[in-house]
Amino acid sequence: MKKFGSENFERMIYINMVEQSGKDFTECLEKATKWEPGQERDDQALKTAIKLYDKNFVDDENTVIILDEIQESSAVYNQIRTFAREFHAYVIVTGSYLGKTLQPDFFLPAGDIDQLIMETLTFEEFLDVFGEYELYRKIDLYGADREEDYKRLMEYYEVYQKIGGYPAVVVSYAQEKNLNKCYEQIRKLIDIFVNESKRYFTDIMDVNLFEKLFNAIALLTMQEKKGVGDLTTELSKIAYQEDSGRMTKKMLNHAISWLQESHVIGYASKAIDCDYKKIKDNSRYYFLDMGIAHYFLSRTGASWDIVKGILAENFVYLSLRRRLLDTEEIAGIAPWFATYEKINGELVFFVRSRMDYKNYGIEVKSADGIAKTAKALLKDGKLDYLYILKGTTKGGIKQHRCTPSG
């Protein structure tokens, strides 16, 4: 962020609310906003605070103010509206754990900000790091290109599904090509997240839930394929095998909400019988980074074939989630999976298009599989089209069934 500011603006003011610069600016803000009865009010108190912090401040479009780790101060966070309305300078506000800003003393400046969510690298971005994006973009989906090109892309996919897209992890792999070093980096990132989360929880027991929750989410993705009635209850059963009285539903909900707000996990909703009018929210969880997913799935003790299948589903979930959030093409507020009550079956993903209002099914197979439920839904008219994503096939199209090459 500092590199971006220094390279694109004549002047940059960087303030990190967890460092000394944050303490200094808070002191400047307190001094600028201090008022006693009978005194005239400073209508430009925020600009006064910036000038107290940096005497060379110029309020124009050649200046950028970067406020990092904004969640550390409600007093500064609540000035975002003033920054947006009264300053000519650009203001960039960033935060790592914005779940804290849901607390009552944080005022959300709706309409005054452009929000950008920083997520881990997508597979396309991962390929771009290694100079393979153009190959990925141009390659034929049904096996018409060179065998070695498909093999090369598959090798990168197999790495990506194990290490994910956290920049520090990708840099480690780019430099050393050592998966074990990448796993060590992922472990460090998890430890940092847990340790930094301690500052936002009054009950240390809440923090101790995280490791158990990660493991419980991984196990639940393997055990339950049709969604559950109450995810909190199911996760509680896995995280604590017996009723020890150590954990309340409120604590668990708090921890889950924190993981969601911190963009560690996301959820999928269930469409009963592929009916977009019968949606049950929060029916399944997924990890929002493939490396984190692999780390905890591989520690459940499941075989690699099982883990690989769940990772393939997680990969497709992330692709659908980005498509849903970044475009107007897909219905819903979260990706959907579906059940078919007639045969007590499950479809991995169900998409209702807002472009042609057709129903699309997506079946994910890490190896060759029969996709019984998906084919039944297509045959019975519940689906208009079916995509079967599986293994290292060469793909093909048969009527309304499409199997891209793996």
Residue ranges and their predicted role:
Residues 7, 11, 351-361:
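Active-site beta-strand-loop-beta-strand hairpin of nuclease catalytic cores
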Residues 175-347, 351-354:
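Accessory nucleic acid-recognition modules appended to NTPase machines
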Residues 364-405:
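Catalytic cores of nucleic-acid endonucleases
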Residues 85-106:
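Sensor-1/coupling segment of RecA-like P-loop NTPase cores
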Residues 104-223:
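Interdomain motor-coupling "hinge/lid" segment immediately C-terminal to the ATP-binding subdomain
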Residues 6-27:
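Conserved catalytic segments around the Walker B and adjacent sensor/switch elements
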Residues 55-76:
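Conserved P-loop NTPase "ATPase switch" module shared by AAA+ and STAND
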Residues 66-68, 90-96, 117:
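Structural recognition of the conserved hydrophobic beta-strand(s) that form the central parallel beta-sheet
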